[in-house]
Amino acid sequence: MTALVIGGAASGKSAFAEQLAVSLSDGPRCYIATMQPFDDECRARIQRHREQRAGKGFATLECFTGLHHAVPPEKSTVLLECVSNLAANELYSPDGAGDGAVEAIVEGVRSLRRRCEHLVIVSNEVFSGGSSYAGDTLHYL
């Protein structure tokens, strides 16, 4: 099964996605983390998510770019969080795919889907935070 969980910032989508992933299988679980720890705010959010996942049986795999290189356990339940961060990383990181970001992400998701039993994907609802965006932001959206 593949599920997409979307919502605004701090909307509870992470907790919902974790609960869904846990309910899908008692087998191996893998959390693919895409947020880079750029600053104190990011590090604090990452720590909160780690604490929230504690005791739920998730192995964590950090993957900031190149999702197709991520190798979760066969037949596992994978929680990919979050596609919005992954897109920003692919578009703007020096080691990202740049203009090939969409293709890189789609291929990465396809690769995960072939390998895992269940895939839960988390993404931000990008238009919940405003309606007027500059050129680079529109390209990202």
For each of these PLM feature ranges, what is it?
Residues 20-22, 46-48, 78, 95-97, ...:
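General N-terminal targeting signals
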Residues 12-19, 77-78, 110-119:
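Short, functional N-terminal and low-complexity linear motifs
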Residues 2-73:
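Conserved P-loop
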Residues 3-5, 29, 76-85, 117-121:
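Generic beta-sheet signal
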Residues 8, 35, 82, 123-125:
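Short secondary-structure boundary segments
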Residues 51, 56-101:
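Helix-adjacent hinge/juxtasegments
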